[in-house]
Amino acid sequence: MTEKKPIFFNRIIDKKGLRDLIAWSFSNFGTARTAEMADKIKDLGFHYATRAGVSISVDDLLVPPKKQELLEAAEKEIKTAQERYSRGEITEVERFQKVIDTWNSTNEELKNEVVRHFRNTDVLNSVYMMAFSGARGNLSQVRQLVGMRGLMANPQGEIIDLPIKTNFREGLTVTEYIISSYGARKGLVDTALRTADSGYLTRRLVDVSQDVIIREEDCETERGITLRSMTVGDKVLALQDRLLGRVVLNDVRHPQTGEVLVAKNQAISADLAKKIVDAGIEEVVVRSPLTCEATGSVCRLCYGWSLAHARLVDMGEAVGIIAAQSIGEPGTQLTMRTFHTGGVFTGEVARQERAPFAGTVEYGKKLRVRPYRTRHGDDAFIVETAGKLVVKGGQQRQEFDLSQGSIVLVADGETVAAGQLLAEVAQAARSVRKATEKVTKDVASDLAGQVKFVNLDAEEKRDRQGTTTRIAPKGGLIWVLSGEVYNLPPGAEPVVKNGDRIEAGAVLAETTVKTEHGGVVRLPEQQDSKGGREVEIITASVMLDKAKVLKETQQGREHYIIETATGQRFSLKAAPGTKVANGQVVAELIDDRYHTTTGGILKYADIEVAKKGKAKQGYEVLKGGTLLWIPEETHEVNKDISLLMVEDNQYVEAGTEVVKDIFCQNSGVVEVIQKNDILREIIIKPGELHLVDDPEAARLKHGTLARPGEEVLPGLVVDTLSQVDYLEDTPEGPAILLRPVQEFSVPDEPSVPSQDSSDGSGQSIRLRAVQRLPYKHDERVKSVDGVDLLRTQLVLEIGSEAPQLAADIEIVTDEVDPEAQRLQLVILESLIIRRDIAADQTQGSTFTSLLVKDGDHIGPGAVIARTDIKAKQAGEVQGIVRSGESVRRILVVTDSDRLRVETNGAKPTVKVGDLVRPGDELAKGVTAPETAAVMAVADDHVILRLARPYLVSPGAVLQIEEGDLVQRGDNLALLVFERAKTGDIIQGLPRIEELLEARHPKEKCVLAVRPGTCQVTYNSDDSVEIKVIEEDGTIQEYPVLPGQNPLVVDGQKVNLADPLTDGPVDPHDILSIYFEYYKPQGLLKAAQTSLEKVQSFLVNEVQSVYLSQGIEIADKHIEVIVRQMTSKVRIDDAGDTILLSGELMTLRQAEQANEPMALTGGAPAQYTPVLLGITKASLNTDSFISAASFQETTRVLTEAAIEGKSDWLRGLKENVIIGRLIPAGTGFNSYEESSNGDEEWEEGEDRLGQTHVISPEPESPKMTVNVTADLGEDVLIDDETAPHVIEKITGGARDFEFASSDVEEDELTEEDDDYGDEEEEDAF
């Protein structure tokens, strides 16, 4: 071997350079030497870092001097936008948008300026070195240190249009500091959530792919996938990178010369990849885990390189787990969601094309545009059909390509200056996927005044709920003409009329407080309570002058007793000082004549009660009579039946224990009520028990009443009033129970006098005595201690004139006998007089005066107080609008709302009622200073009234009507606008999860079911119809949901499954559309094609999410996962096979079941490919042990037991759980089996095509590497060099196996194995 000359690189090596260097060393010299080299580089780096002592200090933070200019330019632009807004030329939304975009581009420019400034002034600046070498920090942090922090979002995720203009070097103001702390907190919370989410994602991925192990050498498939470059936004995943480590399906030939660049089944190294790209080949068909035909695993050639070693993957490598970790690990780096950017601003700003030189603009032939209002409110054109824009100037000419959706800011034939903005080019690839959402923004009035519509038509729309909204379909202007607006309090009447001239302090309106019933005025002591003063008017009163009120204290609670002259005692039910309504109980007679000792059954005899009446209050007695009471003792038990100590219908003495711990108080017959072996109730019925000989005669008497002296049965005479109960099965046999009945007589009228009173005005108030029965006829009253059967109550009745008033209960001392206290009932009308509060500025100043004195007698309807509303400033009254019944607001045009403009002798050109903006001509040489309305025109001057216009975009919801008076800050309208949903609906982790779980996205787009030509028609009501004329002439209609925008234009050709509207694509739709389309060509072909399409869609989508965040993952990892998601089909119809419909199985198993059908002529099974999310796929795996250890353990195990499943212990997880050696790496079974010496094993397949025994492994082609070192000098044995060392030792025997070689194992393998294993884990 010749000595190679060392290579000397003289350049700055940053992080990327270092990565490339180590990768190059690794792929050329193996792990050991790379480790050594990395070590040396580390020493070198630390040595010089120590000597240099790079640190960061305040002086290193250089703020670019151009910052001030940039900020000033931005401020100026924003000021112009603000002026346009106040002139009513752009809407609030457009202004906001302009502000956001201006600051964002300023920030961007400033960032570039920061970098430029560092480069030009001080390349060895420590901040610059750290950030750009990749050691610490990144550009966005440097930008915040020395540029500006930029725009921040508030907690709702809307952007605050006040940017942080300072940086950390200059220091933040307090406001800026507070604003920026929102974002900081959000960042922390987000990170915490992200780690959890990403961890769970990794777990699901590992579970779905843990059994993917390299088990075969070559599956000899004829299928492959096509790789090409992929762009996401501004990031590109180059074909060269995607090809690395893949195995080509067929020979790759040079397009021109035809020479074979890469032979079939050869792996592509970095050099070969470069060759292929240099030859101008744009797509290559490679083998892939997606198309691998190995059963239940992936073969070596379809997987390609193991990326950790840059050579073909080993047999028994657990590639599934590696794939899962490779996808899961970067999850934490994905942002959960970028800030919702309140406004339309999205992260990617369109590419701007500026004129390179002065000249004229020409549109290319194909370019079709339509007028368009940009999001900043400028007039421009939007490109409908892509084409070219040409700028010509003198000898020079330059062309720009404009894609569909780009915005052109110049017209055809317009002259432009150098550097002028010509167009914003839409980024073609992603613009398709942009979904929009409808958002609203309020427009609030900046001044109080009267509303006037200009060119604004309102149209009423009713929705399904019947609410009416007023919408401005075409947009227009709302002018607010300034003036002072007074809100009138409820009930106020204006005392002025339109056109009145008033002075400051004049009364505008007044409101009065009147009494309804009249009476005696009483002014309570506390004159000044918070809500205003209270005036009470006594309408009627009644005093119980014959009865005394005694105060008793029971158990620490005060209790009032009323004692009448006749000695009856009443308990007061309503406490003194409370209000009693009409019909409410005031007091109740204390009376024990109707008290029972036990519970029982109540019967009415000749008693009539009021039908209506709440059971709670009791039933009022209309006509007296007798109450019959049959006592019984009831115990509610609710215990187990085993605790019962007596039998049903047994006669017990008083004091017997009937149930454990329950004793009866009366003697009698026991009735036991039970349900489901639970004792509900025990009833003891007192009475005499008589055994009977003639059960039939006794049964007829059941339930009757027997009067004293009556013979019930022969020889049995009753001596008291009794009820007869027949008992069929007492322990002694049939018997009759004679139950005593108690009688209570009820008088027609209560024995209590009623109290009446009426005052002079004839309003009556009385206390009426009422008897009430709390229980109904035949009601069974459950009680042990007894109840009251009749209550006598005093009820308040107020005359029919004022039943809505309430009476106050008061206890007053008697005038004659100071010792006695009397009960008085007073009916009050209580009126609150408002206090004058200066708090509400919109109401003007109010002044309230009281017009009555204490003790006055007043008639009904008399005015008690008056409140005047006074004007704050002099002016002219206008805008009293009599809308229906009352006036709510008054407008006064004051002097401060007017402006007098002298015309210096020129005759004014405006007329009264004109609306003018600053700069508009009022007379020759005289312009309007502000936006205003013309109030009066004289020969030498014009009087203007200040006003503000507000532009309203089409479709806005109006909140006011023409002529309305609005206060400052009132909402005028709700602007409805569409904004692109930030980034891609959702980004990062949630999007990855949505894809891998194969969810149906919300608001998904409509896909073309068959190829054809589009017809797009826009209807008048903003709805869109899309039809596709297919190749055979069929017309297919596609429904467009509200809120979806078409992506296709009229006459455009669409292919199969192309999106027709915006929104995310549903992978399930892709699968079914392709499957249905190809079905006529055979099930297998259709299933394979449709699965391939959905696989490539998923791989590309997942790649694009990671790529947009700048994370690179090798395709093969995603492919392994997607393979697991798309491996199953669902049997729809079993045909004549032994399958079950609805069963999930692999495509291969379904085809195997169908093969014999082709021979026997039976009906084959029909199936549909299904796309399973990773969770579903994990639960549907063949191994029930793996599925059970993942989720829903009981369900999985139960089903497995019912189906009698067997687990073949294929994957890693099952083996780990059972405690066997895992079948990967050295535990891979083919080693054991091939060393058995029995080479000719057959694969035993069961009906599902599951292999039990794996045939011996064919010899794998070893990679050859030129080891430059001579063995004498450098015996560093590692994965790469080992074969050569061994070759030397064994004398060129290539088919060498450790186990069967002559060399003793220990000599070589210890070190080699350990070294290799550790390396493998730590390599990346």
From Swiss-Prot:
GO cellular component: DNA-directed RNA polymerase complex
Keywords: DNA-directed RNA polymerase, Metal-binding, Nucleotidyltransferase, Transcription, Transferase, Zinc
InterPro entries: DNA-dir_RpoC2_beta_pp, DNA-dir_RpoC_beta_prime, RNA_pol_Rpb1_3, RNA_pol_Rpb1_3_sf, RNA_pol_Rpb1_4, RNA_pol_Rpb1_5, Rpb1_funnel_sf
Record-listed E.C. numbers: 2.7.7.6
SUPFAM superfamilies for this protein: beta and beta-prime subunits of DNA dependent RNA-polymerase (SSF64484)
Pfam families attached to this UniProt entry: RNA_pol_Rpb1_3, RNA_pol_Rpb1_4, RNA_pol_Rpb1_5
Domain of life: Bacteria
Residues annotated as binding Zn(2+): C219, C292, C299, C302
EC class of the enzyme, as a word: transferase
Cofactor note: Binds 1 Zn(2+) ion per subunit.
Assembly description: In cyanobacteria the RNAP catalytic core is composed of 2 alpha, 1 beta, 1 beta', 1 gamma and 1 omega subunit. When a sigma factor is associated with the core the holoenzyme is formed, which can initiate transcription.
Family: Belongs to the RNA polymerase beta' chain family. RpoC2 subfamily.
Designated name of the protein: DNA-directed RNA polymerase subunit beta'
Gene: rpoC2
